Amino acid sequence: MRPTEEKIQKDPSDLPIYLFKQGNNCEAYRYFGAHLETRAGESGVVFRVWAPHAAAISVVGDFNSWKPGSHPMRKVDGDSVWELFIPGVKEYDVYKYCVTTRGGDLIYKADPYAFHAETRPSNGSKVYDITGFAWHDDAWQTAQKKADVINGPMNIYEMHAGSWKLKDEKVPYNYSELADELIPYIREMGYTHVELLPVMEYPFDGSWGYQVTGYFAPTSRYGTPKDFMAFVDKMHEAGIGVIMDWVPAHFPKDGFGLYNFDGEACYEDPNPKRGEHKEWGTMVFDFGRSEVQSFLISSALYWLEQYHIDGLRVDAVASMLYLDYNRKQGEWEPNKNGGKENLEAVAFLRKLNDTVLGRHPHKCMIAEESTAWPMVTKPASDGGLGFNFKWNMGWMNDMLSYMKTDPLFRAGNHNKVTFSFFYAFSENFVLPISHDEVVHGKGSLINKMPGEYEAKFANLRTFFGYMMAHPGKKLLFMGQEFGQFTEWNEEKQLDWMLLDYDKHTELQNYVKTLNAFYKEHPAFWQIDYSWEGFQWIVPDDSKQSVVAFLRKDANGKQILVVCNFNPVLREGYALGAPVAGTYKEVLNSDDEAFGGSGAVHNKSVRTHKKPLHGFEQSITITLPPMSTLYFEVPTKRTRKAADPAKTAQTVKKTAAKKTAAKTTKTAKAEPVVKEEKPKKTSTRKAKAEAEPAPEKAPAKRGRKPKAEAAAAPEAAPAKRGRKPKAEPAEAAPAAAEKPARKPRAKKAAKTEE
């Protein structure tokens, strides 16, 4: 037994420190920070902090007039952990640590493990008791533990708590009030989750929360920790999940924060070529340090367990993975293997995800990772990073670039619509139209769309329809659902007055309808990460800027999706149909109710027996200009397979009966048999001479070639559709082997003419 382990057995209070230094204290917040306690009959607060280089530390606050040295701390482990119990200190008292550096300087630091903090511009920590909140979300928690997070619906509304809607011109709602305002809207719109931009304490409003100083404190801008618990609780009671942004990649240089916590590098990497993001003006965590691992993993679990958060979106993962991220030659140095990968960060992310999802497999760990790093959403045991979702930044960049393009020139950029399918099933993707796309001069989503006022809305409706049908979970930033024209500004609420105008209300209604359709049709979410849930029909009609594909659910139900990215009416557009029968149009982005023209509705469309795109039948539809259409595919009729054993018995019995009957007939009445033969002959003659029946059949078939001839220009893309026979490779030859009916159809057409 090691001396340390022997000591722990004698004094279990040393266990949290031991685990902390091993990088395995996943609940370090229970030990470090400020905790209300009663000792020797006196109530007060015990303070603990990690500061390995400090010469001395004292606790200062209102209770001692902020006098350094009046309440000195002592080392608990004789090394780096400091502790002090102060009687009489109570909840909401403000405090800081006064650290004497090895150089003799005094610096004042906020508590890294504080549960509550002062509101900016003040930055002191506050004593707070997070226990005792009465949760009402048991039903939600139970349901989530049974849910299949990967193969379930996820449609996320990303939002900033302080600018979605304001109480007054400059006064935001507190967390609990915000929930009361938000819940009716989210339920009406049909989103499954809200995702909050960071609500961990931060000093600078303009950082939107991405420069964190309090990894265990919800920002006091919007209330207390229990107000935030109430927010989550109310959302869960309403059936809405809550995801929050979490920022382990970097932290700011504010003097009261983690930076040079005891006068030297503690939380940041001490190597200047690894410890700073100069472009962002922030510091990079030392991911290889055990105490830092305990700190960060404890923070992640703290939000998931103490606040019942349903998932974390991990910010800026790419900046963690690469040593040369945003660094020029000479500003970084390779790892021990000579590569540019940050091996310590990779190991940390694997450990983080293993720990979180090991405890809570139903929670979401979402990576904002913008490169092609492989296996982000594969288990660490298989060499992956262990996340269960990743933002699809490639899809987002390609599609926004495509949608910005004038429709006249989209033909040359058609690959941007289809390229995502080369990698769509390599990771568990979320399709993000996030806050990052509507700031810094990029323009709002609707202002990215080309054309005049009406055209912008038509483009956006088409895009939203395509996005909702594309494999992957969905995310949309607030305001884009009703066509916010201005860029997002964290200081102002959304332009809700736009809903006084028809086009914005109609767009909002369209998004609401899309969201409901998504939730009600498992084909759009049940098999998001496999080719089994998707099939191309028309991938390459670049000339007309049209794509068509199928989405499928686990029970074989299918939705046919057709997108026309050009403001041109397409009449007689032919495309292959997977199943014979009637195709019902169930959503049309050009519907009048959504602000469209409402000029074209296909309603019910019957298949005709003309092989196309690898299918034995096809349909001909009319595509409204700039539109997305959804069709319900008829269900395949399948005959019940016969039981082989029963079939064999039936065959035997039938054969025996036929033999017996034959013997009886031969013995009793041979003339009857002779009379049967002429009847059969006359029947065949009648069939052969019955010209009216064949005449009627060609007449019906004759109408089809006429319709197709009229639509010949539109059929051209269908021919190109045969080009990528990687998808229907097996079906295409089968269709080619059935020419027997085609000559008849042509003959019939000539006869009619």
Question: For each predicted feature, which ranges?
Answer:
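Short glycine-biased active-site loop of nucleotidyltransferases that positions the nucleotide triphosphate
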Residues: 74, 205-209, 253-260, 377-378, ...
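Conserved alpha/beta catalytic core and glycan-binding cleft of carbohydrate-active enzymes
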Residues: 308-310, 325-491, 498, 519-575, ...
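N-terminal cationic-hydrophobic initiation segments that often serve targeting/anchoring roles
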Residues: 186, 232, 304, 353-357, ...
